[in-house]
Swiss-Prot record:
Enzyme class: transferase
The protein's name: Probable thiopurine S-methyltransferase
Binding positions (S-adenosyl-L-methionine): 10, 45, 66, 125
Disulfide bond annotation, renumbered to this chain: none
Chief localization: cytoplasm
Gene3D superfamilies according to UniProt: Vaccinia Virus protein VP39
Pfam families: TPMT
Family: Belongs to the class I-like SAM-binding methyltransferase superfamily. TPMT family.
Gene Ontology biological process terms, A to Z: methylation; response to metal ion
Matching HAMAP family: Thiopur_methtran (MF_00812)
This enzyme's EC code(s): 2.1.1.67
SUPFAM superfamilies: S-adenosyl-L-methionine-dependent methyltransferases (SSF53335)
């Protein structure tokens, strides 16, 4: 899967994964994690997610990472904010910043340890399921190396992949444990049947919520 795939989806406004309010699992479980206010939360492949506004509203610093410049700009447009624009130290990312939220526009795999040195929490709602198997391996290894022991949430989707091509891709519980369990401690918090999500395709996906601790 090449970057152009996602750029094209954003350019054509084919962004069915975008939610119009904060994710209910985030709202339900994040306050139970007891993550200190003022902590920095990384949101990989963040798009223009309103989850970032919700996290900032609770007193967190948010570091979103997003490939699409259009998505980065639209996030602040919907907030009616004019972001400050700068570059990171390596020059590989354009940083859009307003309030306590930064969105780094660039390739997630170009992040280095210095870029995320203040990050202590992670929120992944639609990141790992956006990626095909080979990229999921890279994603988990990359974040595991950069962020040794984060708190946070990972939300995944699982279904019969033979019935539909992703994204969103099916990621089983066993794969989540294999990908992330090497570097991080995971606890399954909830499984939810999402029977209406892909009803026309005859698929009955399961959504899983994991705690990082």
């Amino acid at each position: 899967m090449k970057p152009e795939f996602w750029q094209d989806r954003w350019n054509k406004d084919q962004i069915g994964w975008h939610q119009k309010s904060a994710n209910p699992h985030l709202v339900k479980y994040w306050p139970t994690l007891n993550i200190s206010q003022g902590s920095t939360v990384i949101v990989p492949l963040c798009g223009k997610s309103l989850d970032m506004r919700w996290l900032e509203g609770l007193g967190y610093n948010v570091l979103g990472v997003e490939l699409s410049e259009k998505a980065c700009k639209q996030y602040f447009d919907q907030m009616e904010l004019e972001p400050k624009v700068s570059k990171n130290a390596s020059g590989k990312f354009t940083i859009y910043e307003a309030g306590n939220t930064q969105i780094w526009c660039g390739d997630l795999f170009d992040l280095d340890a210095d870029d995320v040195k203040y990050v202590s929490a992670l929120y992944d709602r639609a990141s790992v399921i956006a990626l095909p198997p080979d990229m999921r391996e890279r994603y988990a290894a990359h974040l595991g190396a950069l962020i040794p022991d984060p708190q946070g949430l990972i939300i995944t989707l699982d279904y019969d992949q033979s019935k539909m091509n992703g994204p969103p891709h099916a990621v089983s519980d066993a794969e989540v444990q294999r990908l992330f369990g090497t570097n991080w401690k995971l606890t399954l918090l909830e499984e939810v049947d999402k029977k209406d999500m892909f009803k026309e395709e005859g698929i009955e996906p399961v959504e899983r919520v994991y705690k990082l601790n």
